[in-house]
Amino acid sequence: MGLAIGWTPGLTALANAQTADGAAATPRIIAAAANPHSVAPARSEPVTDPVADPRAVVTFGKARFTVLAPELIRMEWAADSKFEDHASFVFLNRRLPVPPFEHEVADAGQKLIIKTSALALTYTPGADGRFGPDNLAIEFAVNGKRVDWHPGLVDPENLQGTTRTLDGALGDRTKEPIEPGLVSRSGWAVVDDSTRPLFDSADFRFLHGEKSPWPWVMERPAGERQDWYFFGYGHDYYKALGDYVRVAGRIPLPPRFAFGAWWSRYWAYSDQEIEEIIRGFHENDIPLDVFVIDMDWHPTFSGERGKLDASGHSKGWTGYSWNRLLFPDPDQFLVTLHADGLKTSLNLHPASGIQPWEDRYPEMAKAMGVDPATKQYIPFDITDKRFARNYLDIVHHPLEKQGIDFWWLDWQQEPKTKLPGVTPTWWLNYVHFTDQQREGKRPLLFHRWGGLGNHRYQIGFSGDTVSVWDSLAFQPWFTATAANVGYAYWSHDIGGHAPGAVEPELYTRWVQFGAFSPILRTHTTKNPDSERRIWAYPEPYSSILRSTFQLRYALQPYIYTEARRTYDTGVAFFRPLYYDWPQEDAAYTTKGEYMFGDQMLAAPVTRPVDKATGLATEKVWLPAGEWIEWPTGKHLIGPATVERSFSIEQTPVYLRAGAIVPMQPPMRYTGEKPVDPLIVNVWPLAPGQTSNYEVYEDSGASVEYQRGVFARTPIKATQAGDLLRVEIGPAQGSYPGMLNTRSYQLRLPADWPPVTVTVNGVPVAHAGVTGKGGWSFEGNTLTTVISVARGSVGDRITVEVRRAAGRAARRNELDGFAGAMTRLRGAYDALRQTFPVSDAPDILVDAMQAGDRLGYHPEQAQEEIVRFHKVLSQAQAAAAEIDKDLAQRAKETDTDAQKQHRLDAAARAHRQVNEACQESQSPLASP
C-alpha cells in the first residue's frame, strides 16, 4: 500500500539506496538566507539587552514611552517616577534599532504627542498621570480606516492565544479559558506587564559548566506602576509576531529527532515489555525516535493507594528513583534503547519534593541543610535558587548521565509559588530548559504552557483529552491558534487519553492529523482496552497507520526547514490561514484548516466516513490561486469552498501550484543514515511560473544553528512552455557532519511524462519501471522520477525536462487522475465482495489498469489518457447496471444478511466509479 496521504512520491525503492561516506566539512559561519518574513540577524547568537537605546525613549512627567518599532510602543507610568529596565518574564530585549519617529510637547506643556510611520500616541497626564481612557489615546489605521484605542477599550475580535492544558477537554469545551493573543482583527493588542516578575540579570549567554550565568527571578519593586506594551500591527500578523520575538526571545529550534515519532502510554511497563514494543516497531517497518516512559518508571506505591506523602500529595505521585522490579539494570536498559537509535524521556510530577525513600535523598538533604537521619522530606520550592541547583545537580543530572535525554514534566498541582506572579509551570519550564542550555545541549522540554514568554521553552504537552471525534476536530484550530502567542510546538495525545478503546477509524484519522502537526506522539491512559500499537489494529487501518508514520519521516527535511523558518520569523509553521490571507473572512471562520509550512494547506478529516460509501465528505475553503490536492492530483482554483470526499487512506493536503517539497528515504529513526538521496518533489507549475525553495540542514543537535553553523540548498524551478528547468544547489554554508557529496531524486507528480530529460546537459534515457540509471514514470500518480548521480554539494545541478509540444497547455486532461485510480480500486475491491453472484466487469478493470499501462509505456501517454476517459464512462454505466442487477437478485434469492452485504458493496462500487468520473473532470479551462 502507498503512503497514507492517499498517494505520494514512492520511497520503498530507496530503502537500500547507497549513501555517501558522511565525511564532515569544515564549519564556516554564513549569513542567514533571504526570507521575506525573517527577523533573524545575519550572524549572531541570541542577544538580550533589556535597556532600550536612549534615543528610543521619551519621558514625560511620571510616564516613560519607548518606541520599539513603528507599531510597538512600551508605555510606563510610575507614581515615584522610577522606571523598570530589568528583563521581565516576557520582554527580554528592548535595545532594538531605533525606528524613525517624532515627538512634541503641546498645549503649554500639557500634552505629549509621539508619531511613528504607523501610529500616533497622545498623552495628557492630568492630575497624577496614571494611564486611563481620558488621558491616553493611540490612533492608527487598519485597511485604510482610522482606529482609536484608549485604555479600557474592549476588543471582541482578539484572535486568542492558547491555554495551559486541555485536561478533561471534550471537543472545544475546555476547563481553562484560552488566553488572548498578540493579534486581532481589530488591529491591536495590549500586553499588561505591570505585575509580571523580573529577571535579576539579562546575561542569557549560557555557557557549558558551573560558571555559566543563570538569571533568576526577582520581584518587582513596590509601588504603584503601569507597564504596558501596545501592538498596533493592523492585519500584518507576520510582523506582529516577528517583532514580538525580537523583544521576547526567539522560538527555539527543537532537536531534529523531535520531529520523528514518539511512543507514550500510561502503563507499568517492564524493561522487557518496552523492548518488545520496540521490536514491534522494527518488525512492522514503523519508524520511531522517542520512547516516553510514564510515571511507573519509579515506585508508585500502588498497594498504598489513597495514602498521602508528607507534602500532602498521593504517595508515589512524585519519584526520582528507578523501580528496580521493572528495571533491574537501568544503565543497560538505556544502552539498549540508545543502540536502537531511540531517545528516552521520563515522566515527572515535581510537586511532592524529595521524599526520604528516594535514592538521592541523603545527598539532597545534606545539600539543603537537613539531617538525613530525620527522614524529613525536602519541600519543592523551585524559586529558591539553592533548591533548584540541588534539585538539578543531585537528582536530575545523574539520571541524565545514565541516558535520559529529556524530561516530561507532566503536572504541577499548585497554581502559585512563594513569589507573587510566579507560577510553578512557567518557572519550571525556564529552569529545566535553561539548565540544558547550561549543559551545552540543544534543549528539549515536554511540559505545559505557562503563559506569555513560555514560547522560549518548548515542547508543549496539551494534557488528557477525551477520545472522541469532537476532540480531534478541535485540535487543528487549537494548535494553529497558539501561533498567536508564539507557541509553535503543541504535542497532543494522538488517539486521545481516556476513557478506553478507540475505534480504528478515529485512531487512524487522529494519526493522520498527527503526521501533519508539530509533534507526532501517541498516548493513552492506563486501561488495557486502550490500544495504540499500530500492528494491533485490523486491516486496512494497520497498513494506513504504518504508511502515515512513514510519510511523516519522509517529510522530515520539509518539516525541519519550516521549523527553522519558525525560528527566523517568529511565526509557527503550523499556523492559521489568516496569517497569509488576512483580508479573507473565510480565513478566520474556517477552523479545521491550517498552513503546514509555506507550501502546504492541511484540512484533516475529523468525522467518520459514510458507511454506505466508505467516504467522508468535507467542505474545504481554498484561498486565491491554484491548489493541487495531494491525494488525488486534482487542481482546484480559489478562492472557493469546495465539497470533497475522502476515503480512509486519504488525508486532505493541498499544495500551491509549483510547490517544492524536499523529502528523504525511509529511516527507522532520525539520523539512522545520511539524507542521501535528497528527494525533491516539484509539483506542476503554471505557465511562465518560477518557484524557489531552500532546504535547511544543520547538525540537528547543537545550538550552533543560532550562530550561523548550518547549510541551505537552494532549489529553483521554472516552467517555460513545455520545458521545465529545475536547478539544485550549490549548497551554501556548512556544519559538522555535513555531506560533501550527495545524490538526488527529482520527482514531478501529476504531470505528463517527458520526451527528453537532461542532467547538466547530458541526456538521460528512459529506464523502464526500475528507473535505474535513468528516469521512470509512475503511472498511477503520473509522477516522473529522475535519478541524479552523486556529486559535490558545492556544484549546481540543472535538470531539464521537455514534454511533447502543447502538453503543458493540456494538463487539464490529467486532472484528478490519481484520485480516479484510487476510486476505481475501491470499486474493484467492493465488487469482488459480491462474488460469485457478480464480479468486477472487465471494463472497470480496464479503466483501473490505465495507470499501470502508463508506467510501462509513458510514450503512449496521450493515447492512453484519451482512451481512459472513454473507458471510464463505460465503467460508470457498467457499475450502475451491476448495482441495479444485484438489487433485483437480492430480492429473489438472498437471505437478509447476504442481501444487505451485496447491496452495500454494489452501491459503494457505483459511488466510487461516479467519484472517479468527478475526479477526472478538470476545473481548469480547456486549451
List the model feature ranges, each with a label.
Residues 17, 21-83, 103-123, 128, ...:
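Mature N-terminal, pre-catalytic/accessory segment of carbohydrate-active enzymes
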Residues 18-247, 256, 273, 278-279, ...:
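N-terminal accessory segment at the very beginning of proteins
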Residues 655-763, 780-781, 788-904, 911:
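Accessory, solvent-exposed terminal regions and/or long lumenal/extracellular loops of proteins
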Residues 11-16:
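Sec/Tat signal peptide C-region and signal peptidase I cleavage site
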Residues 1-10:
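Bacterial N-terminal signal peptides
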Residues 87-102, 370, 628-648, 756-786:
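Solvent-exposed beta-strand/loop surfaces of large extracellular or lumenal domains
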Residues 110-113, 117-120, 770-798, 806:
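A surface-exposed beta-strand-loop module
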Residues 27-44, 49, 121, 133-656, ...:
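Catalytic-domain carbohydrate-binding cleft regions of carbohydrate-active enzymes
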